Amino acid sequence: MTGFVVTVAFRVKPEHRAAFREAILENAAASIAGEPGCSAFDVCEKADGSEIFLYEIYDDEAAFKAHLATGHFKRFDALVASWVAEKRVLTYNRLNPGN
């Protein structure tokens, strides 16, 4: 195994999309800068703005669990809880490094 991948799809309530976008970009930057076990944290948005998709790569599942325990993640999660209409989380074992 060459990593642990997490994908998250958020459907955000329209009135909170701009604030959510700002909050997730801040969380992503903090994850890359402050978590040695996080090697990628891509934030993507559907063209119509209706969904935000995250693609995160961690060294292993333990590094992802450490991410969930960080202060910046806990703040983000509490902040956006009422802004999110739907959240889907999937995890994968990465079979090959893409770059």
Model-found features: residue ranges?
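Glycine-rich beta-strand-turn "strand-cap" elements at beta-sheet edges
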Residues: 2, 42-50, 77-99
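N-terminal first-folded block
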Residues: 4-34, 42
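Short, well-ordered beta-strand segments in beta-rich or mixed alpha/beta enzyme
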Residues: 4-11, 40-68
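Short flexible/disordered coil segments
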Residues: 8-9, 71, 96-99
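Short acidic, gly/pro-rich beta-turn/loop elements at beta-sheet edges
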Residues: 18-20, 51-53, 99
